[in-house]
Amino acid sequence: VNIGDPVPALDPLTGLISVPANTPASNYTITYEICETLNPTNCDQAIATIGVIAAPIVAVDDAPAAVNGGTGNPSLINACTNDTLNGSPVNVADITATIVTPASNPNVALDPATGTVSVAPGTPAGTYTITYEICENLNPANCDQAIVTAVVNAGTIVADDDSVSGINGTSGGAGVLDVLPGDTLNGNPATLGGGGNVTMNVVTPAAP
């Protein structure tokens, strides 16, 4: 509790104690005195104790739909959307989020300021988890943790069949067929060599 924070107050005209909204969790005491109207010096004092608890905070695990690692997704999910404070969706202005355990690959990240989970293009396929914690700003010790599980799939790769005919076997020929045209990775042409997006291996060579 800090100076200037709301605190419970006793109305001496009614004897009722009120607790303002946004009062930090704590045990508060108010000492009051009652005096006889007929004999104003005939008085006694007592203490009223008011226990104020923090609002329930719940961070819920998230498992968004799988994402293509080749293309990524800058806003896969907002991890805070299903988290609640006092039974209502959290307002990021009312909580502070921190990363407890980051993903094993930094390409999969959670922005604590916004709750947004992103997957960068070129992320290897795998299942990545991020453990995060949200704490109420009003009561910084009022916290809960949750886990985001992001499944990253390999890119969509397509190799089309190819054919060529009429090759003179006696003279032969180099480069009689380029098999790459029509092959794609994530909808883009497959390319080899330095800066290429695929590699090529011979699975079954031609046989006599």
Over which residues does each language-model region extend?
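Surface-exposed or secretory-pathway low-complexity segments enriched in glycine-proline
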Residues: 1-20, 73-118, 173-208
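Acidic, turn/loop-rich segments in luminal/extracellular domains of secretory-pathway
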Residues: 2-52, 100-152, 204-208
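Extracellular interdomain linkers/hinges and stalk-like, low-complexity segments
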Residues: 27-33, 37-89, 127, 131-133, ...
